[in-house]
Every structure is written in C-alpha cells, then in structure tokens.
Design a protein with these regions (language model features):
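Membrane-proximal, non-transmembrane interface segments of integral membrane proteins
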Residues: 1-44
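Long amphipathic all-alpha helical oligomerization modules
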Residues: 41-53, 58-144
C-alpha cells in the first residue's frame, strides 16, 4: 500500500513536469522522475524493501511534490521567481535526485548481502555433503 501511494505521488509529480516552462528546472525534475521510477521498479520487485527506504516516503516524496506544485503554480500565475529561489530549487532537486540514487544503492546492497548469504549457505551444505560422502566411502572400503 505504501508503494502504491508513493507511486501515485510520483505520477502526480510527472504530470507537473511538462508544465514547467523553465528548461533548467524541467530538466532537473525529469532526472528526479527517472531516479524515482527506478526506485519504484525495485520496490515493486521486492516490496519488503520498502522499510529500507522509509525516509524517502515519509519526507522526500512529499517535499518533492510540494515544492514542484508551488513552483508550477507560481509560473502559471506569471510570478517572477528570484534567481536565488530558482537556484535553491535546482539545488534541492539535485539533492533529492542524489538521495534517490542512495536509496537505490541501499536496496542493491541488501540484495547483494542476501545473495552472498545464500551462496555461503549453499557452499556450506555442499561441503558437508562432500565430507559425508567421503566418510561413507571410507566405511564401505574399510568397515572396521
């Protein structure tokens, strides 16, 4: 459910992006959108991982949507946005994009750890089976 609600927010965000007239801001927003979609693909594949990226859902996603809606509204009403405000928005979008990449890395690291654990378990079982076979063979050849 958390994933679906978050994805709905990204879809709302995606609808805002084309309406942004400032090409630099629109470009940064598209980058953030791409990174968010990659993260959601990972989460749909492994829904249990949502706990690992909880801060994305509890803070970043709502903030992203809020600042985007406010900026789009200002543009729509013809307001002149100060250069400092524009630069701050771009900076925040870049930071959110980086945070999304970090969240993706966090999920991949978890998958890597799971794979390593599974490989170690398989290796241990195979080693034990090999040792057991050796013992059984030695008993067959030398019962005493």
């Amino acid at each position: 459910r958390t994933i679906e609600e978050g994805f709905a927010k990204i879809q709302t965000y995606d609808q805002i992006v084309p309406s942004i007239r400032d090409s630099e801001i629109r470009s940064e927003m598209r980058i953030v959108s791409r990174e968010a979609h990659v993260l959601f693909e990972e989460l749909y594949e492994s829904p249990r991982d949502v706990k690992k990226v909880r801060d994305f859902f509890t803070f970043y996603l709502d903030s992203l949507l809020s600042i985007s809606e406010k900026y789009a509204d200002l543009e729509r009403r013809g307001a002149q946005v100060q250069l400092d405000t524009k630069n701050q928005l771009i900076s925040n979008l870049k930071m959110i994009g980086q945070k999304l990449k970090q969240q993706q890395t966090l999920l991949l690291e978890g998958d890597t750890v799971d794979l390593e654990r599974e490989l170690l378990t398989i290796e241990k079982v195979l080693t034990q089976e090999t040792e057991q076979r050796k013992q059984e063979e030695s008993y067959r050849h030398d019962p005493f």
